[in-house]
Regions:
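N-terminal secretory targeting signals
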Residues: 1-41
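Intrinsically disordered, low-complexity regions enriched in Ser/Pro/Gly/Gln/His and often acidic
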Residues: 27, 56, 111-114
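Catalytic and binding regions of secreted/periplasmic enzymes and modules that target cell-wall glycans
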Residues: 61, 75-127
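Export/targeting segments at the very N-terminus of extracytoplasmic proteins
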Residues: 29-68
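Acidic-enriched, low-complexity/disordered segments with a strong bias for Aspartate over Glutamate
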Residues: 5, 40, 52, 95, ...
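Major-groove DNA-recognition helix of helix-turn-helix-type DNA-binding domains
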Residues: 71-73
């Protein structure tokens, strides 16, 4: 085996190791820069039920204004509860995912779409 071939293999192996280390560092830094919170899971779940991205954006804005996606949120003056801020005491005993389901049903029954509910909220500061 010529000496150049062995050196080439060592050099090639070193480059591959270097690239692998860089990729590993990059993946690690991405993991650390974005850690999932319960709110991220609530939004992901809501987005899975509201497929249209534009409609989800409206819902995200609406419920951020209403409760900041907090399932324990309670508006004492208005008597509204949960992520969707509905006037139903049952919501305070429901998990966040069930609150999202109920809230989406309410939006559909009252406003047909999240964007219609958001437009109403912009005019009246409630939906």
């Amino acid at each position: 085996m010529p000496a150049g071939d062995a050196g080439h293999k060592i050099s090639r192996c070193g480059i591959l190791m270097g690239v692998s280390c860089l990729l590993l560092l990059q993946m690690t830094s991405v993991e650390k820069s974005w850690s999932k919170t319960p709110v991220d899971y609530y939004k992901l779940y809501a987005h899975s039920l509201v497929i249209d991205f534009k409609e989800f954006q409206c819902l995200e804005k609406l419920w951020t204004k209403e409760s900041n996606w907090n399932p324990a949120s309670h508006n004492k003056s208005g008597g509204a509860f949960g992520i969707p801020q509905m006037k139903n005491k049952k919501l305070k005993n429901m998990d966040a995912f069930t609150q999202i389901q109920w809230g989406l049903r309410y939006v559909k029954d009252r406003d047909q779409t999240p964007c219609n509910a958001w437009a109403y909220w912009l005019k009246h500061k409630h939906y």
